[in-house]
Amino acid sequence: MVTGALAVLLVLTAVWAVKLIQVARSVNANAAYWSQPRGEPGGLLYVALGDSAAQGIGASEPDKGYVGLIAQRLRDGTGRAVQVVNLSTSGARIGDVLDTQLPALGSLRQTPDIVTVAIGGNDIRAYDRATFGAATDQLTAALPRGTYVADAPYFMHGRWQRDAAQAADLLRASAVEHGLRPVPLHDALKAQGWQAMLTQFAADWFHPNDRGHRVWADAFWSRISAADDRFS
C-alpha cells in the first residue's frame, strides 16, 4: 500500500512539474501572441494594460485569459467585431504602465472604445503605502476617462494580503477621484473562499487558471455591462 501511495505521489508530482513548466513557457508564448492586434478590425477597439494576468498567464491559451474573455463578451453583447490591442507585459508594475504602456496607448491611431487596467499585484512584493499611493495617483491621472481599473488582487493571508487590501483601497479611491471606473476585483476573488487555491490557480499557485480567469472576467464584465449599455 505504501508503494502504491508513493507511486501515485510521484505521478502527481510529475504532472505538477510539467504544468509548472508550461506556465513558465507561456510567458514568452503569450507575449508573442499579443505582440500584434488580435480579433477583427473595423469594429470596437479594446485596449488592455497590465501585467501577466492581462497576458493570460495561467490560462490554457492566451485568449482564455480574462482579456480574451472580455473581448468575446463584447462580441456577444454587441454583435460587432472586436479588435484587441494588449499592451500588458508579464512582471509589470505600475511604473511600467506609466513608462511604457501608456505611451503605447497614446500612439494608437484609433481611439479605444474600452480600456481595462489590472496592475499592482507585482507591486505588493515590495509594498510601501506612500510610494504605492503616489504611483497610483500618477497612473489614474494619466488614464483616459472611463477606463476600467481593477483594484489589487486578493492574496489569501499574511502580510501580502494586508498590503493588498490597503492597495485595493488606494486604487479604488484614486480611480473614482480621476473619473475612472473601479472594478472590485479584490472582493470578487475574496468571495471565492480558500477553496479557490485548489481550483482557480495554475501550477505556480500565483496566476489564475482558466476558471480563475473567468472570475477576473466576471468582475470586469459586471462593471462594464452596468456602466455602459453599448456593451450589454
Pin down the residues of each PLM region:
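N-terminal secretory targeting modules
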Residues: M1-A48, A59-S60, R75-D76, Q110-T111, ...
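Conserved SGNH/GDSL esterase-like catalytic core that processes O-acyl groups on lipids
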Residues: Q22-V27, L45-V47, Q55-A134
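Alpha-helix initiation/capping motif
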Residues: G39, A59, D63, G77, ...
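Cofactor-binding loop segments of dinucleotide-utilizing enzymes, especially the Rossmann-like FAD-
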Residues: D51, T89, A152
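Ser/Thr-glycine-rich phosphate-binding loops at phosphate-binding pockets of nucleotides
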Residues: S52-A54, N209
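Hydrophobic residues within alpha-helices
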Residues: A53, Y66-L74, L139, L171, ...
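Short, acidic Gly/Pro/Ser/Thr-rich loop/turn segments
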Residues: A54-Q55, K190
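Alpha-helical cap/lid subdomain in secreted, periplasmic
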Residues: T100-S232
